[in-house]
A protein has these predicted regions:
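Terminal amphipathic helices with adjacent charged low-complexity linkers/tails
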Residues: 20, 38-45
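Membrane-helix cytosolic exit motif
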Residues: 28-41, 122-137, 141, 167-192
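Non-transmembrane, extramembrane segments of multi-pass ion/lipid transporters
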Residues: 42-77, 133-172
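Helix-coil boundary and interhelical linker segments in multi-pass alpha-helical membrane proteins
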Residues: 97-105, 186-195
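Hydrophobic core segments of alpha-helical transmembrane domains in multi-pass membrane transport
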Residues: 17-31, 88-96, 111-118, 178-190
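C-terminal amphipathic alpha-helical interaction region
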Residues: 26, 30, 82, 97-131, ...
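Single conserved hydrophobic/aromatic residue that forms the stacking wall/gate
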Residues: 1-8, 12
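C-terminal transmembrane helical bundles of large multi-pass transporters
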Residues: 15, 60-104, 108-109, 153, ...
Length: 195
């Protein structure tokens, strides 16, 4: 007696799809957070290079090469977001054709749950860390220069990409996955090609 003959195969496919869907937002948010960190380090290295090589820049007598910094930020933004874009577009066909329409529905449901939860968490946590730093800088809990301020700066360093990059990207992620799923829905097998 197989699972499919008892009608349980679709239940397991739906659960597998939901599990995959819940994992995708966490994967995408980790990629976007790493992308922000990598771009920041590239920018820091460029600024240090300019301070070393452009004479008079430290004293304020020379102008920095701001075009190079803009180029680094633009290139990093475009290149580092290719992988999340590919994942968002490729996962619905992979799940839909591989496991079937039922699993794809589960993936979208799980993706929606994961995206909403992460977006709310990241927007609120990022805003809280940002405001905590501002609160400490107003003189509370020791003010600027204290250990509390140093900890608040670290929190704000994590909080800014949370609320400005990873949180908003969850909306785009679930929208793209849903649109791609709608486009391919008429082509999907009910049961899938793999199982």
């Amino acid at each position: 007696d197989s699972l499919g003959s008892r009608g349980l195969g679709d239940v397991y496919k739906r659960q597998v799809g939901m599990f995959i869907g819940i994992c995708i937002p966490f994967l995408i948010s980790s990629i976007t957070m790493k992308a922000v960190g990598d771009a920041a380090f590239e920018m820091i290295n460029e600024i240090r290079r300019q301070f070393r090589e452009i004479s008079g820049l430290m004293e304020g007598k020379a102008d920095p090469d701001s075009e190079k910094c803009v180029e680094i930020a633009t290139t990093a933004a475009l290149k580092k977001m290719m992988l999340p874009g590919i994942i968002a577009v490729a996962m619905p066909p992979i799940i839909g054709f591989g496991l079937g329409a039922v699993a794809l529905g589960g993936m979208l449901a799980g993706g929606l749950l994961g995206c909403v939860a992460l977006a709310l968490f990241m927007a609120n946590a990022g805003g809280a860390w940002d405001n905590a730093k501002k609160y400490v800088e107003k003189g509370n809990f020791g003010g600027k220069g204290s250990d509390t301020h140093a900890a608040a700066v670290v929190g704000d360093t994590v909080g800014d990409p949370f609320k400005d990059t990873s949180g908003p990207s969850m909306n785009i992620l679930i929208n793209v996955m849903a649109m791609v799923s709608l486009v391919i829905s008429s082509l999907l097998p009910i049961s899938g090609m793999l199982f």
